[in-house]
């Protein structure tokens, strides 16, 4: 959140909505000015629930008219650099007139989060089920990749064992 929030302060086109299944995170976000957060207890059933909760929260905030693109990022990528996210956002803004639909970070053959979708793909994202994420939608389109040099930035640490493995890299 802090990395994205720093980007938001430099770029008025960015608005951040946090989706969490943890009440503690929701409470924490409510103590921060301009931190939009939504509780999604169903997220434990799969990533599709998190995606839907985020989209619906943005739509409920009546921001849909302003949103051309939706970026989905996970909170457990400790090595993700702000510069990489800036490169991704710059690529989206640079391609805005070309109507590209999907943007993602990549290191070699490894593709990862964050991923950005044009608002025209929202119906497809809302139709996702279970643990199917946005990548299943992204694969249907000519994705614009932003190449990064360090694959560790794409590392997603979901468990304590992943964390221990990552530390030894």
Predicted features and spans:
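Conserved beta-loop-beta/alpha segment of the NTase-like Rossmann-fold superfamily
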Residues: 44-119, 123
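A general structural signal for well-ordered alpha-helical segments in protein cores
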Residues: 26, 48-51, 85, 122, ...
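Hydrophobic packing residues within well-ordered alpha-helices of enzyme cores
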Residues: 25-29, 88, 125, 166
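Glycine-rich "substrate-gating" loop/helix at the edge of Rossmann-like oxidoreductase active sites
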Residues: 38-45, 77, 151-154
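Conserved alpha/beta core of the MobA/IspD/sugar-nucleotide pyrophosphorylase nucleotidyltransferase superfamily
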Residues: 123, 127-169
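Conserved beta-strand segments of alpha/beta enzyme cores
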Residues: 15, 36, 101, 142-144, ...
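Conserved N-terminal catalytic core of the sugar/cofactor nucleotidyltransferase
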Residues: 1-68, 83
């Amino acid at each position: 959140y802090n990395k994205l929030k720093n980007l938001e302060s430099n770029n008025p086109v960015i608005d951040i909505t946090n989706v969490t299944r943890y009440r503690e995170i929701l409470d924490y976000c409510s103590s921060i000015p301009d931190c939009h957060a939504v509780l999604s207890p169903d997220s434990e059933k799969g990533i599709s629930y998190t995606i839907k909760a985020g989209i619906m929260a943005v739509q409920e905030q009546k921001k849909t008219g302003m949103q051309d693109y939706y970026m989905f990022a996970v909170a457990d990528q400790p090595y993700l650099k702000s510069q990489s996210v800036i490169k991704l956002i710059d690529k989206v803004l640079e391609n805005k007139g070309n109507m590209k639909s999907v943007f993602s970070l990549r290191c070699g053959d490894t593709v990862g989060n964050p991923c950005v979708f044009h608002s025209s793909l929202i119906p497809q994202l809302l139709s996702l089920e279970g643990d199917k994420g946005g990548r299943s939608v992204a694969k249907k389109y000519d994705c614009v990749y932003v190449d990064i040099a360090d694959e560790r930035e794409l590392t997603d640490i979901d468990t304590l064992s992943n964390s221990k493995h990552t530390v030894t890299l």
